Regions:
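Short, charged low-complexity linear segments at domain edges
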Residues: 1-11, 33-52
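A generic structural signal for short, non-catalytic loop/turn and secondary-structure boundary residues
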Residues: 5-7, 29, 87-89
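Cysteine-centered iron-sulfur cluster-binding motifs in ferredoxin-type domains/subunits
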Residues: 12-32, 57-76
Length: 153
């Protein structure tokens, strides 16, 4: 069955390389379905210290797929996925844990990332994307920045 690239599926795409363990996604979830437990890792990132994640659970049994967790993530580590076949017999099996998030196919929905759609990316037919390909904003090149400064002055 054909699906639109902006379809918000019942799975999540998580890029561990981008995640700092700040728990913004958990804080902004209106239903409180995201559980994160961290410990200091000592790894320095551009913005500050990165935490090591011990627990990262998403309870799909209660998720309403609003996407506020995706919008709240300042590092673009969490995205809505494009899968839709997560039927289970028990509610506890609907909890996605950190290992499942690591193994999940990296095919983010273009719902919150229209720049992916503008590039013609289709999560259902194209290859999985690496963490550096799904940023919220494209980094401008030097010429574009210089031209902007000239126009502003």
């Amino acid at each position: 069955m054909p699906q639109h690239p902006r379809f918000r599926g019942e799975d999540f795409v998580w890029y561990e390389e981008r995640c700092t363990g700040c728990a913004s996604c958990a804080k902004f979830c209106p239903l409180g379905i995201i559980r994160i437990v961290t410990r200091p890792s000592g790894v320095m990132t551009k913005e500050g210290e990165k935490n090591a994640l011990e627990v990262f659970d998403i309870d799909l049994a209660r998720c309403m797929f609003c996407g506020l967790c995706v919008e709240a993530c300042p590092y673009d580590a969490l995205h809505m996925g494009s899968g839709f076949e997560r039927a289970r017999y028990t509610r506890k099996d609907l909890v996605i844990n950190i290992d499942e998030l690591r193994r999940a196919p990296k095919r983010p929905s273009t719902w919150f990332r229209p720049q992916l759609e503008a590039k013609g990316y289709n999560p259902h037919t194209d290859r999985p994307l690496e963490w550096h390909e799904v940023g919220r904003h494209e980094a401008p090149d030097l010429e574009a920045m210089q031209a902007r400064w000239v126009e502003v002055r």
